[in-house]
Curated annotation (Swiss-Prot):
GO terms for molecular function: RNA binding; translation initiation factor activity. GO terms for cellular component: eukaryotic 43S preinitiation complex; eukaryotic 48S preinitiation complex; eukaryotic translation initiation factor 3 complex; eukaryotic translation initiation factor 3 complex, eIF3m; synapse. It comes from the Eukaryota. Phosphorylated by TGF-beta type II receptor. It comes from Rattus norvegicus (Rat). This is Eukaryotic translation initiation factor 3 subunit I. It is found in: Cytoplasm.
């Protein structure tokens, strides 16, 4: 498996995301640049210029018309995907940590950090109502008093959002009323990443407590646990197979004090049902911060602390592989 190396960032990668068809790959890092690449050959299609701080999150809508980014420059920005033009600038009081389009692409949500005396909020804007954008007034704002949100995604059919907190809690918030519908605490430490399955019936969480866990997306019932020896920064579910890929490594601050072999910087593949690890992919120099499966399941990408993104196309052996129970 020879990876395609994407070199477009000067700082460590914070998130990578495919669009729905998987022909484009969006990457953001702790620099102000938002890059978009052709996933088939790793050619850079363009950049979205405008942010002035680290970019924490990126999302593309269903038909890849618009791109949404959230940054530490205290803004969430909406872009025209094709032209790179900035369509909206939503100012916030603190850094924007997570952002996302709902299934229809009409409503956006983003969450802000608890910092500088400001509370953590989840804001909802309806893009069909220009007055909300112009006045920077969301139609709904949910305060999070206890523990800040560290990752969030839209639930099935855009009826709720699923948010992971610094404390390890998972909350399901209604997108209509803002109330907490379900609350569970299966992780003991911060939830770094949440990714849904292709059919949105379940999702996988990646946590600092060295595990990734599988949950039902409506009841938030805990199904499976994938254990490692290192904090897990990101986890993604295969759209075709019962496989989950985990990316992680140590905390960035411990990296220089150990050799790479001890750091365990491989991407690790687990079987979804048996919770057994069956493969590893080396490559990154430093921890992996974000992983994503291509929507056709034939490749996956990872973005690391080293600032590189690697696109891996699976060998034929991967597709013939049968797991012996």
């Amino acid at each position: 498996m020879k990876p395609i190396l994407l070199q477009g960032h000067e700082r460590s990668i914070t998130q990578i995301k495919y669009n729905r068809e998987g022909d484009l790959l969006f990457t953001v890092a702790k620099d102000p640049i938002v890059n978009v690449w052709y996933s088939v050959n790793g050619e850079r299609l363009g950049t979205y210029m405008g942010h002035t701080g680290a970019v924490w999150c990126v999302d593309a809508d269903w038909d890849t018309k618009h791109v949404l980014t959230g940054s530490a420059d205290n803004s969430c920005r909406l872009w025209d995907c094709e032209t790179g033009k900035q369509l909206a600038l939503l100012k916030t009081n603190s850094a924007v940590r997570t952002c996302g389009f709902d299934f229809g692409g009409n409503i956006i949500m983003f969450s802000t950090d608890k910092q500088m005396g400001y509370q953590c909020f989840v804001s909802f804007f309806d893009l069909r109502d220009p007055s909300q954008i112009d006045s920077n007034e969301p139609y709904m704002k949910i305060p999070c008093n206890d523990s800040k949100i560290t990752s969030a995604v839209w639930g099935p059919l855009g009826e709720c959002i699923i948010a992971g907190h610094e404390s390890g809690e998972l909350n399901q918030y209604s997108a209509k009323s803002g109330e907490v519908l379900v609350n569970v605490k299966e992780h003991s430490r911060q939830i770094n990443d949440i990714q849904l399955s292709r059919d949105m019936t379940m999702f996988v969480t990646a946590s600092k407590d060295n595990t990734a866990k599988l949950f039902d997306s409506t009841s938030l019932e805990h199904q499976k646990t994938f254990r490692t020896e290192r904090p897990v920064n990101s986890a993604a579910l295969s759209p075709n197979y019962d496989h989950v890929v985990l990316g992680g490594g140590q905390e960035a601050m411990d990296v220089t004090t150990t050799s790479t072999r001890i750091g365990k910087f491989e991407a690790r593949f687990f079987h979804l049902a048996f919770e057994e690890e069956f493969g590893r992919v080396k490559g990154h120099f430093g921890p992996i911060n974000s992983v994503a499966f291509h929507p056709d399941g034939k490749s996956y990408s990872s973005g690391g602390e080293d600032g590189y993104v690697r696109i891996h196309y699976f060998d034929p052996q991967y597709f013939e592989f049968e797991f012996e129970a």
